[in-house]
Amino acid sequence: MAAARGAMPTAPSYWRSRGPRALLLYPLSLLFGLLAALRRRLYRAGLLSQVRLPVKVIVVGNIAVGGSGKTPVVAWLVEQLRAAGWHPGIISRGHGGSARGVLEVVASGDAGVCGDEPLLLARLTGVPVFVGRDRPAAAAALLQAHPECDVIVSDDGMQHYRLARDLELAVVDPATLGNRWLLPAGPLREPVGRLDRVDLVIRHGDEGELPPRLGARAVPMRLVGDGFRGVADPARRCEASAFRGRRVHAVAGIGRPQRFFDQLAAMGLDVVPHPFPDHHRFVAADLDFAPGEPKLMTSKDAVKCAPFAPADAWEFPVTAEIGSGAAERILERLQHGRPPA
């Protein structure tokens, strides 16, 4: 793989181990954990009120900061729900978007306004998608505009306890768990033990280890793709073989860009990586290099680059493949509720 070009914001190196700097911040992590635990208990005790929607709610989230692959899981989940006769809608915070308040996302929307992931989900699924920092308000607006919806899928929001939920799916990349400490000494928003209380743990990636009690019940996931399409003109298609023997530039503004670079390299491509921050607001200048050489990117970045993408920019669409039995477990619990604790 050739030398990297671009601005790569990485997670703090001290999140990977329990070294001196992490130890220095550990007291703050203890405080963070105490406050988070107190908040959870207040919601459980009813001292902080939750909003209970008149439909089922499924939260797809994570306990660590950074990318874990939630967006493809949400798209997969919506497909499973529709196949089973449900009428899902999606809510999201809209990270990276400028919208204030609640906004309905349409497939022809602007990622700079609604966020890249909600726009991608609107295009992938065709179901109603609403964004808003206030998730209960976003869900209420969705149900008012689309009363046929009978299940809400929350893209992220596991820690947004004000929204009551019927099911929780945690998408976990063990490599992002780092030193297993809470913020700011580590990358966790909640302790690993929080995963004991979710309905399904979906493991994405082979790096790192999960605690044995979680690894035994986690279902595997991988992202698969079989070709490329033009960013500016999606009707243009080509296979990976078209790029073999040529230098390609991989552009990624996602949580874990190295995974994308490695996936392309595993396909036999000579990759020059161009990492950018997660949710990066791309401009034409970001793609103004190496004219004539292919520029490959994820779907999440393609929705932002389409208005100005050159003809040599290609999207690599992927779908989530999740271990057998996962959909059945979700649908069973959705229909009949969680088993007694």
From Swiss-Prot:
EC number from the UniProt entry: 2.7.1.130
Keywords of the record: ATP-binding, Kinase, Lipid A biosynthesis, Lipid biosynthesis, Lipid metabolism, Nucleotide-binding, Transferase
Classification via SUPFAM superfamilies: P-loop containing nucleoside triphosphate hydrolases
Signal peptide: none
GO CC terms of this entry: plasma membrane
Domain of life: Bacteria
InterPro entries tied to this protein: LpxK (IPR003758), P-loop_NTPase (IPR027417)
Residue sites binding ATP per the record: 64-71
Single Gene Ontology BP annotation: lipid A biosynthetic process
Pathway it works in: Glycolipid biosynthesis; lipid IV(A) biosynthesis; lipid IV(A) from (3R)-3-hydroxytetradecanoyl-[acyl-carrier-protein] and UDP-N-acetyl-alpha-D-glucosamine: step 6/6
Listed NCBIfam families: lpxK
Listed HAMAP family: LpxK
PANTHER family: TETRAACYLDISACCHARIDE 4'-KINASE, TETRAACYLDISACCHARIDE 4'-KINASE, MITOCHONDRIAL-RELATED
Described function: Transfers the gamma-phosphate of ATP to the 4'-position of a tetraacyldisaccharide 1-phosphate intermediate (termed DS-1-P) to form tetraacyldisaccharide 1,4'-bis-phosphate (lipid IVA).
Protein name per UniProt: Tetraacyldisaccharide 4'-kinase
Gene transcribed to yield this protein: lpxK
